[in-house]
């Protein structure tokens, strides 16, 4: 990996010469000949320089301003040995939180911390403890900006392309090049000249010294153009000034470090240096040109022209693009350096500018602003989002005023609402937001679960504001809001709570009204804000990773699953806000409610083309929208956003249950919203049951959270598990369109018992196994889900979505989905146990504890084989006749594909075994195995074993195989350590048939950008089996092992990859930015709770 800025590709030019999109990377060119210096001179110079050049390994712990969270490498060099000062680029030092180490040529590695990053120009300083370098003799590299001249032969000494030490040759060709333009929405230097040479630098050489034959640094390498061999170097005049301030600040310290202050002034405007020929075309008068040429140094070829002005800045309303600068305070000025001297030394003073605008001379007075006052030094972290005042850099890019509430990373809460990165927040809960303090004040009035409107602007569509609904996290997915402030004396960003718990107000209900305290679900709504994770995942985007390579999880899996979300992410969500009116609230309005309700029902019933089945089932249809927090991307879930149609199967005054496929609700750690077809209302739901085998989940909602009008019109569908569908039967496929309109068609069952065979994904996730599904002759496509009903609207099957991964090659794959019918017999059995009381642990549902069912399963993956094929594998004619008599339709036998690792069947059954009978009863389908397991629970004795008759390599065997009981909770505990998310191996991982020999270990399911796990390569898809020699067979052992680790300690980790390859790596724990915490589902409160396991005191 390389420096992020150095890996940017060049882009098309916006103008003919000056505004080109260059790429920050480092280049290699053959050395030029005819050098004025001898080879011995260069050897001596390089002998001094190379030991003073260091490789910088930086980790941006949070997204901030123009930078994203991540790890990179670059170059720096020692400019003050006694004080321990390293010079490098600003985009290496980073404007936000950063952790860095410097490695010398002798492989000594020392910690360094940032002390200054220039707000505009591409340079910054790290500091280190000189006494930490024990085994290397080195000298500082002197800075000589005056030595730079056209034709000077130079060497660039740096970490080119990660090669530790590289020496690239070149010749300075220009000293007055325009500052390179890297990105429209990222960091760019301006108001300075750059130097140019054909030295061919690439990624990793940012911050390298550009030296002459005497070993002096004449410039600082900053970037390059990827389409050519041109490298761009920053002049050092302003670097020398900043260094002198930094040295004086260090010398003035007593016993306690203090932050350095380097005066910097600004007018919040950008100048370009244009030639006299172009300035004449702008209307420059001839007499003015004569005066300027006469007063300027010999060889001056142009003047400074205003390129852009930041709104609400000191120059706004005074200067305009195209204005030509003639004099400042009565002196002719044509160079950036002279202007910057006046600005930096005149903070708070008034400058008199003489300009020409279209040939008309004008004079303006402008106040010089402190540049540091518009450079953000703090940010708010809430629900994984990073929000801070809009910086001068981005204000210049986007043409917004400085200081607005800027989204550097949307995290989870804002991403869920559709707020993008780089957005400007204008309103929250109908209150204006003009600064970060306003946002904190509004958030302090909101509580968990509150849904409020948010208004934002984007630079890509700056003339229109967008409104969305933001939901404050109901569960403790992340830490409470934290306010981070930069501390230049320590190099760290210090965190403190942004909101005091006492300031949290009562919860707001789903309809926008306070929930009364007598409603059973309110036990969690009235609690103060709890912790909600220190860092989101970027990536989403943030996004976080689930593969062992780059681990990108930005792809949302199925295109169909995300299509509606992409198209409706703003306007659709905003429209939902209008559904929460007050007209259906009070008892006094019941008569009006009934009238409105009657009209709504009439409109539905009078639908011209609606079938009887469609009208009967429509009150039971519900649309699910599901969001998965990046901090809880468990069990290999392949997206953060899902939607699909579900069916209400139970509805009473105190509990409602809806069923939906597991490609919509994949894991229990999710935020679920339900929109009902029967009435325009949207309420949250909670995952209460995930079937361990079958592709369905049960979601509970609280009918008392609705008003009586909406609750009364909703109906539960009638399930009809018997008789089973047969080939040729007519059914109605009913579901919801994107606008929540019921849609149906009549179809014919072509195969009522099609066996599924879904392969494993690259990143193991749930896949339906041991299931028979229903196939139809026609449907509505792979993105339409719903139900199969008879003519009366009774549910015969769920028409659900299944996730699969299509692999085109060993390195290329794509997520897809398909839809099939899921018989309702298994659903009806679980539903009955939930209503009457199951045999498992209790779960709090809408304030009432209900015993949940346990499901007994044989943890073996099976697949059917035709009897004609089975005969070739040694199946006898007698058994063939028995199986045909048992099931003349299927004419198949079940074979073992594999056993789940850690199951009771492991080491008993082998791949390829044919299962002929269970308890002496022939079996031909998955239902036979499932029925045998259920029979064990009905017996009067507690027998957990099945007597299997199998055929193995032509030999008939009798085996006693144990079964396993599983609940429907899914994964309920996860630990975040050093930015990697670990959990117990989930069934999809165990289905691979492998667990480490060193004990099962804890499974790394994902990692976070900018974390120690990212920095040291502790990626996903592997088990951690040892921490500092201590075995970690489960999460309890892992938690105990990590609690003993201290901040800054190097930790030795032993891992085993999914392919069985062991590995040992080390990483450095960082408890300041990445404390160790766990997230655990609490069945007593039905909440996900976040607990800190280890953090700095």
UniProtKB/Swiss-Prot annotation:
Record field: compositional bias (Polar residues): 546-556
Record carries keyword Hydrolase: yes
SUPFAM superfamilies assigned to the protein according to its UniProt record, in alphabetical order: PDZ domain-like, Trypsin-like serine proteases
Pfam family, one: PDZ_2
Composition skew (Basic and acidic residues), residue ranges: 558-567
Cross-referenced InterPro entries: PDZ, PDZ-like_dom, PDZ_sf, Peptidase_S1_PA, Peptidase_S1_PA_chymotrypsin, Peptidase_S1C
Keywords carried by this UniProt record: Cytoplasm, Hydrolase, Protease, Serine protease
SMART domains attached to this UniProt entry: PDZ
Subcellular location: Cytoplasm
Annotated PDZ domain residues: 269-366
Catalytic-site annotation from UniProt: 524, 785
Job description of the protein: Probable serine protease.
UniProt protein name: Protease Do-like 7
Native species: Arabidopsis thaliana
């Amino acid at each position: 990996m390389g420096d992020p800025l150095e890996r940017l590709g060049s882009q098309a030019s916006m103008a003919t010469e000056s505004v080109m999109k260059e790429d920050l990377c480092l280049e290699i060119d053959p050395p030029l000949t005819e050098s004025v210096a001898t080879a011995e001179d260069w050897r001596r110079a390089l002998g001094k320089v190379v030991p003073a050049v260091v490789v910088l390994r930086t980790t941006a712990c949070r997204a901030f301003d123009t930078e994203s969270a991540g790890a990179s490498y670059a170059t720096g060099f020692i400019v003050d040995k006694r004080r321990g000062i390293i010079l490098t680029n600003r985009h290496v030092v980073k404007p936000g939180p950063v952790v860095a180490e410097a490695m010398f040529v002798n492989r000594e590695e020392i910690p360094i911390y940032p002390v200054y990053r220039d707000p505009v120009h591409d340079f910054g300083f790290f500091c280190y403890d000189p006494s930490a370098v024990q085994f290397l003799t080195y000298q500082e590299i002197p800075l000589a900006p005056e030595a730079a001249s056209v034709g000077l032969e130079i060497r660039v000494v740096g970490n080119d392309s990660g090669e530790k030490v590289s020496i690239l040759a070149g010749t300075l060709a220009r000293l007055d090049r325009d500052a390179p333009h890297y990105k429209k929405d990222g960091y760019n230097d301006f108001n300075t000249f750059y130097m140019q040479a054909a030295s061919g630098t690439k990624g990793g050489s940012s911050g390298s010294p550009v030296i002459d034959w005497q070993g002096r640094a004449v410039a600082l390498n900053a970037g390059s153009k990827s389409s050519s061999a041109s490298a761009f170097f920053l002049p050092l005049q302003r670097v020398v000034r900043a260094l002198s301030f930094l040295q004086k600040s260090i010398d003035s310290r007593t016993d306690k470090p203090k932050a350095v202050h380097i005066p910097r002034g600004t007018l919040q405007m950008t100048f370009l240096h244009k030639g006299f020929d172009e300035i004449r075309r702008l209307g420059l008068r001839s007499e003015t040109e004569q005066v300027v040429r006469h007063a300027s140094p010999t060889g001056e070829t142009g003047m400074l022209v205003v390129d852009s002005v930041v709104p609400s800045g000191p120059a706004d309303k005074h200067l305009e693009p195209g204005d030509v600068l003639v004099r400042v305070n009565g002196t002719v000025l044509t160079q950036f350096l002279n202007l910057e001297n006046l600005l930096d030394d005149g903070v708070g003073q008034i400058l008199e500018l003489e300009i020409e605008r279209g040939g008309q001379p004008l004079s303006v007075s402008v106040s010089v602003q402190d540049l540091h006052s518009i450079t953000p030094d703090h940010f708010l972290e809430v629900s994984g989002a990073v929000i801070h005042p809009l910086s001068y850099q981005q204000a210049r890019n986007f043409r917004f005023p400085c200081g607005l509430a800027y989204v550097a990373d949307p995290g989870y809460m804002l991403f869920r609402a559709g707020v993008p990165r780089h957005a400007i927040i204008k309103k929250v809960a109908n209150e204006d937001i003009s600064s970060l303090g306003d946002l904190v004040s509004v958030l302090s009035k909101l509580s968990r679960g509150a849904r409020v409107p948010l208004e934002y602007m984007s630079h890509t569509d700056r003339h229109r504001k967008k409104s969305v609904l933001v939901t404050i996290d109901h569960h403790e997915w992340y830490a409470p809001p934290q306010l981070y402030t930069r501390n230049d004396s320590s190099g760290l960003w210090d965190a403190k709570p942004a909101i005091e718990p006492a300031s949290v107000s009562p919860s707001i209900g789903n309809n926008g009204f306070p929930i009364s305290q007598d409603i059973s679900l309110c036990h969690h709504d009235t609690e103060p804000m709890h912790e909600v994770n220190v860092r989101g995942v970027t990536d989403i985007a943030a996004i976080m990773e689930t593969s062992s390579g780059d681990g990108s999880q930005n792809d949302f899996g199925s295109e169909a699953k995300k299509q509606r979300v992409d198209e409706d992410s703003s306007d659709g969500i905003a429209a939902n806000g209008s559904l929460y009116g007050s007209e259906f609230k009070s008892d006094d309005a019941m008569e009006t409610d009934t009238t409105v309700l009657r009209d709504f029902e009439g409109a539905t019933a009078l639908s011209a083309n609606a079938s009887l089945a469609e009208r009967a089932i429509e009150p039971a249809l519900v649309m699910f929208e599901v969001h998965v927090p990046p901090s809880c991307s468990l069990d290999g879930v392949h997206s953060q956003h899902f939607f699909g149609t579900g069916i209400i199967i139970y509805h009473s005054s105190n509990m409602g249950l809806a069923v939906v496929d597991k490609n919509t609700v994949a894991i229990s750690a999710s935020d679920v919203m339900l929109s009902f077809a029967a009435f325009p209302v949207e309420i949250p739901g909670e995952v209460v049951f995930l079937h361990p085998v079958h592709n369905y989940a049960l979601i509970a909602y609280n009918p008392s959270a609705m008003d009586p009008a909406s609750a009364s019109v909703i109906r539960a569908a009638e399930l009809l598990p018997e008789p089973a569908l047969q080939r040729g039967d007519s059914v109605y496929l009913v579901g919801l369109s994107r606008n929540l309109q019921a849609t149906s068609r009549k179809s014919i069952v072509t195969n009522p018992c099609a066996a599924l065979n879904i392969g494993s994904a690259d990143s193991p996730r749930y896949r339906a196994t041991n299931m028979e599904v229903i196939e139809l002759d026609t449907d509505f496509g792979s993105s339409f889900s719903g139900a199969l009903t008879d003519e009366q609207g009774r549910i015969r099957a769920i028409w659900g979505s299944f996730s699969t991964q299509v692999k085109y090659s060993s390195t290329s794959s794509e997520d897809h989905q398909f839809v099939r019918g899921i018989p309702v017999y298994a659903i009806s059995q679980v539903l009955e146990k939930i209503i009457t009381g199951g045999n498992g642990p209790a779960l709090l549902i809408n304030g009432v504890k209900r015993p949940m069912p346990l499901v007994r399963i044989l943890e073996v993956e099976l697949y059917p084989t035709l009897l004609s094929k089975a005969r070739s594998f040694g199946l006898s004619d007698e058994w063939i006749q028995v199986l045909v008599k048992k099931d003349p339709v299927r004419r198949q036998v079940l074979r073992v594909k594999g056993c789940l690792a850690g199951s009771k069947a492991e080491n008993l059954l082998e791949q390829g075994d044919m299962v002929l009978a269970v308890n002496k009863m022939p079996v031909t389908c998955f239902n036979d195995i499932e029925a045998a397991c259920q029979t064990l629970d009905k017996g009067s004795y507690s027998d957990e074993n099945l007597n299997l008759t199998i055929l193995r390599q032509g030999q008939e065997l009798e085996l006693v195989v144990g079964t396993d009981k599983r609940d429907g909770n899914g994964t309920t505990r996860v630990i975040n350590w050093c930015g990697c998310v670990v959990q117990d191996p989930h069934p999809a991982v165990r289905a691979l048939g492998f667990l480490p020999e060193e004990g099962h270990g804890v499974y790394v399911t994902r990692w976070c950008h900018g974390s120690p796990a990212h920095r040291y390569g502790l990626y996903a898809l592997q088990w951690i089996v040892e921490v500092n020699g201590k075995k970690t067979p489960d999460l309890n052992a892992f938690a105990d092992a990590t609690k003993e680790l201290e901040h800054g300690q190097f930790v030795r980790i032993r891992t085993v990859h999914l392919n069985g390859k062991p590995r040992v790596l080390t990483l450095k724990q960082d408890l300041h930015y990445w404390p160790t915490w766990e997230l655990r589902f609490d069945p007593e409160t039905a909440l996900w709770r976040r607990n800190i396991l280890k953090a700095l005191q």
